[in-house]
């Protein structure tokens, strides 16, 4: 989106705070329905980030697939579960929770240090979209594939990783 600088900065801060508050809501709220709604807020904020970065197709796919389908499916599954099983044997902190928290925190710290230490300007992309001539013979689906493989490669990979994590989480919940 071509917005003036202060408006763009305000929207970035507003969406970033929405992401942080929604993420905290997903983790800290004890009612799983409220957590699912907080997850919907996070996914909508991510989609709005894509709109701010002129990735309209990725934003539409984010809204349709994640907010429209996966979040509704999570809400549907949570509403069918027995609500009383969430509050039985409620322990505030266990050794497994502490170990999991320690592992996740160490992964987060290592990712942050890796991202900050990487020289992003030194990365040379082998294929750029301005080198690919989009002819009239190329169909729309091929153009979308070209853009996903060049311009929107990182957002596409982030979405696939998020989908993989959601799938692993669904399998873990289903096994219990």
Curated annotation (Swiss-Prot):
Disulfide bonds: none
Signal sequence coordinates: none
Pfam name, any one: Oxidored_q3
Molecular functions (GO terms): NADH dehydrogenase (ubiquinone) activity; quinone binding
Membrane topology (UniProt): Multi-pass membrane protein
Key words, A-Z: Chloroplast, Membrane, NAD, NADP, Plastid, Plastoquinone, Quinone, Thylakoid, Translocase, Transmembrane, Transmembrane helix, Transport
Catalytic EC class: translocase
Entry superkingdom: Eukaryota
Protein name in the entry: NAD(P)H-quinone oxidoreductase subunit 6, chloroplastic
Lineage: Eukaryota, Viridiplantae, Streptophyta, Embryophyta, Tracheophyta
């Amino acid at each position: 989106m071509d917005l003036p600088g202060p408006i763009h900065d305000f929207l970035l801060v507003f969406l970033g705070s929405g992401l942080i508050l929604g993420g905290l809501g997903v983790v800290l709220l004890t009612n799983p329905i409220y957590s699912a709604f907080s997850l919907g807020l996070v996914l909508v904020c991510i989609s709005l980030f894509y709109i701010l970065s002129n990735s309209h197709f990725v934003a539409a796919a984010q809204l349709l697939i994640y907010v429209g389908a996966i979040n509704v499916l999570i809400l549907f599954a949570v509403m069918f579960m027995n609500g009383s099983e969430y509050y039985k044997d409620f322990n505030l902190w266990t050794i497994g929770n502490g170990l999991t928290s320690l592992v996740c925190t160490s992964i987060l710290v290592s990712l942050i240090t890796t991202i900050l230490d990487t020289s992003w300007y030194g990365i040379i992309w082998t294929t750029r979209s301005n080198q690919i001539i989009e002819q009239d013979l190329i169909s729309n689906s091929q153009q979308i594939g070209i853009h996903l493989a060049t311009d929107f490669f990182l957002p596409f990979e982030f979405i696939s990783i998020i989908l993989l994590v959601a799938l692993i989480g669904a399998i873990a919940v289903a096994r219990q």
